[in-house]
Amino acid sequence: MAKVALIQRELKREKLAAKYAAKYAELKAIAGDAKRSDEEREAARLGLQKLPRNANPTRQRNRCEITGRPRGTFRQFGLGRAKIRELAFAGDIPGVTKASW
C-alpha cells in the first residue's frame, strides 16, 4: 500500500493540471506554431515556464485505485496487476476469465 501522502500528491497534480489545461494548451500551440513571430513564441515559452511544474500533465502517474501502486497499473481497470489477478480469480471483474488454450 502506497503512503497516503503520495496518493494525495497525485490528486493535487490532477487538480493543477485540470486548472491550467486550457492555458497550457494555448501556450503550447503558440510556442510550436512556426507562423508566429520569434518574439511571440519566446513569450509563450516563458509563459510555460512560469506555470507550476505540477500543471504539466506528463508529471502525473497512473496509480492503482485500491493500493496506490504506481507500477503495473492497467488503464482499462485502473487497478494494479496484483489486484486484477486477485479480483479476477474471485469473479469480481465481469467478463474477465483465466486464459486457456
Curated annotation (Swiss-Prot):
GO CC annotation terms, alphabetical: cytoplasm; small ribosomal subunit
Question: Where are the compositionally biased (Basic and acidic residues) regions?
Answer: 33-44
Matching Pfam families: Ribosomal_S14 (PF00253)
List the InterPro entries: Ribosomal_uS14, Ribosomal_uS14_bac/plastid
Asked if the Swiss-Prot or TrEMBL record annotates the protein with the keyword rRNA-binding, the reply is yes
UniProt-annotated stretches for the region Disordered = 33-63
Q: GO molecular function: any one?
A: rRNA binding
Which UniProt keywords are present, listed alphabetically? Ribonucleoprotein, Ribosomal protein, RNA-binding, rRNA-binding
The biological processes this protein is annotated with in GO are: translation
As recorded in UniProt, coiled-coil segments are none
Protein purpose = Binds 16S rRNA, required for the assembly of 30S particles and may also be responsible for determining the conformation of the 16S rRNA at the A site.
Q: NCBIfam families given for it?
A: PRK08881.1 (NF006477)
Can you state the subunit structure given in the record? Part of the 30S ribosomal subunit. Contacts proteins S3 and S10.
Q: Which family does it belong to?
A: Belongs to the universal ribosomal protein uS14 family.
Please identify the protein, giving its name as recorded: Small ribosomal subunit protein uS14
